[in-house]
C-alpha cells in the first residue's frame, strides 16, 4: 500500500515522537536527520502519543472486523439453510435450532423411541426400563407412565386419531392402549422373539409388527388375532412402516436389505440391497415431497403420471439412502454421519431430511443438493430416535442416557 506525502509525513512525525518520548534519543536523532524532520513545539503536541493511538485503534478494528465476518458467515448460513429472517420464512422450511427447549428426565434406562401425539400437545417416549412415558412438549411437564410390559419397550405408534397407542416389547408381546383412559385394552402374543417394531395401519383396523424371529405379522385391532405373516427376511427385522394409504409396508433388517410388501397379497414387491451393514430405520416420503424428489433426482415418472413412492433408509454403514420403490433404484446416498444411523424421516415441508445417529448428532439434509445443511450436536451420548411434528414447529429426540429432548424449529 502506497502512502501519500502527507500521510508519510504524519507517520514519520508520529514515529519520531514515539522514539523521543520513550527515551530512544540516539535512534530519534538518526531518524529525525534521515527523515529530514523539522520538529517544533506545536507539531510535538499534535503528534504526541499518535503512534500508540493508531496501533490500539488498528487492533480494536481488527477485532471488530473479525466479529462482523463471523456474523456475516452466520447470516449467510442461515439464509442458505432456512434460518430465521424475521417471521418471513415459510414454516415449511423451519428446521430445529439449538439449544434444546427442554431436556426431560424420568426414564431409568435408554430411551428407544419418541413420537408426537397426532392431535394433542403431548409426546410419548418408550424405554428399556419397560415403561412408556407421556410428556407435554409445550411446557416440558411429565404427565404419566404406562406400565404393563415386562421387558424393554422397543417401539410405539398412534392411530390417526390419537385415541389408540400400540407398543411392542422384548417381552415378545404387542399391547394396545386406550390413550384416553390410559389402560391396556389388548395384549397380542405370536412372535417367538423380541418384537422390535410396531405400527398402526392408516385405516386403524390393523397393526403390523416386526420381530427378531425374522417375520412381520399383521394383527386385527378389534380381536387381537394375527391375520397375516410376511416371511422373507433372513435375519432380525428391525423396523416396519406402512405407506400413506396402507397398501404397502416397508421393512428393514439385519440382513442388510429393505423390503417392500404388498399388503393384500403378502408378496415382496421389492428387495432393496445396497447397504453394507444392518439397516436400522426406514421412512416413507410424504406425497407432498414427490415432485421435489423427482426434480432433485431426475427419477422418471411412471405411466400413471405419478412419481414415487419413495423410501428412506438409515444403516449402521453410516449412510442414508433414498429409494424409488417403483423401480427398486437407489436415487441417492447421503454421507456425513460418523456412526450408526438410528433414525431418519422427511421434514413435514417435504424439502429436507432429518436424521439422528450414534455420532451424537441430529442432522438436517438438503437432499436437492445432497448435502448436510445443519448439524446439531444433540448430546453427549447416542441419539436413538427422533420425530418431527406434522403441524407444530417441534422435533423430539431420545437418548441412550435416558433423556428426551424437545427442539424448537424456526
From Swiss-Prot:
Residues 1-38 are annotated as: Required for self-association and interaction with PAFAH1B2 and PAFAH1B3. Residues 1-66 are annotated as: Interaction with NDE1. Residues 83-410 are annotated as: Interaction with dynein and dynactin. Residues 56-82 form a coiled coil. GO terms for molecular function: dynein complex binding; microtubule plus-end binding; protein heterodimerization activity. The keyword Nucleus applies. Its main location: cytoplasm. Residues 1-102, 388-410 are annotated as: Interaction with NDEL1. Keywords: Acetylation, Cell cycle, Cell division, Coiled coil, Cytoplasm, Cytoskeleton, Developmental protein, Differentiation, Lipid degradation, Lipid metabolism, Membrane, Microtubule, Mitosis, Neurogenesis, Nucleus, Phosphoprotein, Repeat, Transport, WD repeat. Pfam families: LisH_PAC1 (PF24951), WD40 (PF00400). The modification N6-acetyllysine is found at residue 53. Residues 367-409 are annotated as: Interaction with DCX. GO terms for biological process: brain morphogenesis; cell division; establishment of mitotic spindle orientation; germ cell development; lipid catabolic process; microtubule organizing center organization; microtubule sliding; nuclear migration. Residues 7-39 form the LisH domain. The modification Phosphoserine is found at residue 109. Originally the subunits of the type I platelet-activating factor (PAF) acetylhydrolase was named alpha (PAFAH1B1), beta (PAFAH1B2) and gamma (PAFAH1B3). Now these subunits have been renamed beta (PAFAH1B1), alpha2 (PAFAH1B2) and alpha1 (PAFAH1B3) respectively. Belongs to the WD repeat LIS1/nudF family. Can self-associate. Component of the cytosolic PAF-AH (I) heterotetrameric enzyme, which is composed of PAFAH1B1 (beta), PAFAH1B2 (alpha2) and PAFAH1B3 (alpha1) subunits. The catalytic activity of the enzyme resides in the alpha1 (PAFAH1B3) and alpha2 (PAFAH1B2) subunits, whereas the beta subunit (PAFAH1B1) has regulatory activity. Trimer formation is not essential for the catalytic activity. Dimerization mediated by the LisH domain may be required to activate dynein. This is Platelet-activating factor acetylhydrolase IB subunit alpha. It comes from Pan troglodytes (Chimpanzee).
